[in-house]
Amino acid sequence: MDIRGTTIICVRHQGQVTMAGDGQVTLGNTVMKHGARKIRRMYEGRILAGFAGSTADAFTLFEKFEAKVQEFHGNLPKAAVALAKDWRTDQILRKLEALLIVADTNTTLVLSGAGDVIEPDDGIAAIGSGGSYALAAARALTRHAGLPSEQIATEALRIAGEICIYTNDHISSESLP
């Protein structure tokens, strides 16, 4: 799946979790919007979710995930596995082209349309067109800069935006203590 048009990163560092995303929305090779918000809070603000991919597909998955979070009373891993199972087996959901990063104070997970639920070893996850660049930058900053998670996530996205034409520097972020 070739996801272009956004970058989302989640950094878990020094007891804090920050998810950040750029604001660019691209239709083909045209920038349609600069300040979109692709990070959402759910479950009384205790869970963060960020999405990359087709906007309509991402909103559909976001709504489905939010319903699973409610069903499992905020248990992030159980909600993620339940969504991945539905995503993999439902004929309509299977066609959706989007990725999600979800996080609470204990867990960070990447959810894919292939039914994958991946928990990164180092607490850092990134998706979207500039995801690899942001991930590399965040890992380096985490190891060497001594910055808090919000600054690491923001700077990693800025670096990704300098490299990836589908990522801009209109960054929004949300943090959990």
Swiss-Prot record:
Family named by the database record: Belongs to the peptidase T1B family. HslV subfamily.
GO biological process, one term: proteolysis involved in protein catabolic process
InterPro entries assigned: ATP-dep_Prtase_HsIV_su (IPR022281), Ntn_hydrolases_N (IPR029055), Proteasome_sua/b (IPR001353), Proteasome_suB-type (IPR023333)
Residues where Na(+) binds: 161, 164, 167
HAMAP family for this protein: HslV
Enzyme class, broadest EC rank: hydrolase
Keywords: Allosteric enzyme, Cytoplasm, Hydrolase, Metal-binding, Protease, Sodium, Stress response, Threonine protease
Task performed by this protein: Protease subunit of a proteasome-like degradation complex believed to be a general protein degrading machinery.
GO cellular component terms, semicolon-separated: HslUV protease complex; proteasome core complex
Active site: 6
Annotated protein name in UniProt: ATP-dependent protease subunit HslV
Subcellular locations according to the entry: Cytoplasm
Highest classification ranks of the organism: Bacteria, Pseudomonadati, Thermodesulfobacteriota, Desulfuromonadia, Desulfuromonadales
Pfam families noted in UniProt: Proteasome (PF00227)
EC number: 3.4.25.2
Catalysis performed (reactions): ATP-dependent cleavage of peptide bonds with broad specificity
Source organism (scientific name): Syntrophotalea carbinolica (strain DSM 2380 / NBRC 103641 / GraBd1)
Assembly and interaction partners: A double ring-shaped homohexamer of HslV is capped on each side by a ring-shaped HslU homohexamer. The assembly of the HslU/HslV complex is dependent on binding of ATP.
Regulation of catalytic or functional activity: Allosterically activated by HslU binding.
Domain of life the protein comes from: Bacteria
GO MF terms held by the record: metal ion binding; threonine-type endopeptidase activity
